[in-house]
Amino acid sequence: MSTWWLVVVAAAAAAGLVRAEDRYHPERLAAGEASAATRSAAESEASFWVREAQEAIERREREGAGAKQAAGHAKNVVMFLGDGMSVPTLAAARTLLGQRRGQTGEEASLHFEQFPTLGLAKTYCVNAQVPDSSCTATAYLCGVKANQGTLGVTAAVPRHDCEASTDVTKRVQSIAEWALADGRDVGIVTTTRITHASPAGTFAKVANRNWENDNDVKQEGHDVNRCPDIAHQLIKMAPGNKFKVIFGGGRREFLPTTQVDEEGTRGLRTDGRNLIEEWQNDKESQKVSYKYLWNRQELLKLGSSPPDYLLGLFEGSHLQYHLEGDESTEPTLAELTDVAIRVLSRNERGFFLFVEGGRIDHAHHDNYAHLALDETIEMDRAVKVATDALKEDESLVVVTADHTHVMSFNGYSPRGTDVLGTVRSLDSNRMPFMVLSYTNGPGARIQQNGVRPDVTTDANFGALRWRTHTDVPLDSETHGGDDVTVFAWGVHHWMFSGLYEQTHVPHRMAWAACMGPGRHVCVSAATVPTAALLSLLLAAFITLRHQCFL
């Protein structure tokens, strides 16, 4: 792949045009690696990943035949995504939760940790050992592995390659699209910008996750008519324009540079369009009930009869961290989840809801361990809202992560040691070290003569934005390459045990819900042979591609 786009991006950076949040996810792959690192040509095809997932489902069907016959199918599917929610994050978050309750902490459990089934998913991208949130979103929402930095396309599309992404045979559909095709309703909820990688995986087809508004696309020299930005795709194109609930941040991606939002954040669009108004006009023309929301008070005033369509953009960029947010304007993830379920539950056929605790990831990137753990606890509260609201015998709730981080939970401290404090011993140089530390990130301190500084003497030691001990200095802490947990509750939860590719997750959800083009629990495994089913499945994928982009 050519390096022309690197020159464009470098020039944009010099001019101060690159979005500030790029520091969380710097592009670390060298030019050309987006395609050259592909392990095999087959992995660039959607059929490779679809076949692998469907064959695994067939094996699981045989293993769980009795449970399959007894449970029926899931009418409602809710997927919770803890962005960057690694196993050490879970262990530390549950310990913090217990210590907040006056316990020693280790014995506590998050609500979703009590789900009956636990599995593990492998998170690598086709071209990367350690993934980002866009190739993983394509995996756990579309069932196909992709290149780092791309969304809703196969690995045949290198990052930044606008032209390749316009090929309909290289686009893939998400479980949200499968739900819509089955007559169910769809909602997406996140604490990040709604155009960010994870939520965008439900609807966007882009060669670069950073193309959140039209100016992002233009900066790389591309035609927005050929490669529409993510905000445009959400508001003006299927499937996004059919979503009943859209809750998150990112007003700036929808507003022109000539306009500021309700809290003074200036828009980033250079096409002069106000996509929030366009969304309202579209709903008005359809003669459906709708409402645009920008703060918590408006959300809470909806009451028991919210309108059919809701667009809630609660910040100019990402929502504030829970511990730092303004309660008058900032809704909690639990509140957003509650409203979303109430709206979507009115569809008798059921719904698919995607909920992301997205700022776990951002806190880890900044080495803010306390904030990362609190964001995890906040997502857990949202999960409890969902399981309290839904019937276990007609719903499936899956809680997972897209990737991990490099925070470790270490030392040999006694039971009940403050999880946010120091280990009850010193290092070989008689210096204290933290229970939670990071392999890399911006929290690294300069060592004098090979001796670590005493971090407990920092002026802001223990503050929310105090950076815990870090080894390797980087502007942004990196993701990890280890497996992520998959917790399942409800109808056919047993399908999610074991170790499998992350691409299995949407196929298994669709199987349990009897929707989408793959194998379904509603169809006997003996009725449709795998080879015949795969032919039908691929034909359905192609049909959906064309329907989605007409």
Swiss-Prot record:
EC number of the protein: 3.1.3.1
Protein family (similarity comment): Belongs to the alkaline phosphatase family.
Required cofactor names: Mg(2+); Zn(2+)
The protein's name in its UniProt record: Membrane-bound alkaline phosphatase
Active-site residues, record numbering mapped to chain: S133
Positions of the propeptide removed during maturation: 525-550
Binding-site list for Zn(2+) 1: D361, H365, H479
